[in-house]
Amino acid sequence: MGYLKTMVDVTTTEMNAIRCLIDEAGIEYESIVSEIANCEGKVIFMGVGKSAHIGKKLAATFASTGTPSFFVHATEAVHGDLGMIESKDITILISNSGNSMEVVNCIKYIKAIGSK
């Protein structure tokens, strides 16, 4: 019975998250999706730690559905890989805390070249 309860708990949590998304999605959601759909460059995902794993999966999913994308590890980015990002790209930075220094340190460069 323990496995069934776990499945019910996890499924309930996921359903609640979807309900929350439906309730809270607004103009920001529409704007973000529109930017990605109309991107003339690549969609680049960036993160460190567990956020890096999520970014890799997102990049692979986007690429498999026809959206040019790739992942850049934020630590590697600040040590030379930022040159892969172009002004026509959209860069999605992923951080659980929002304060990961490696990720935060990339923001200035990304803005300077005009990437969104």
Identify the residue ranges that each predicted region occupies.
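An N-terminal, well-structured beta->alpha segment
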Residues: G2-G41
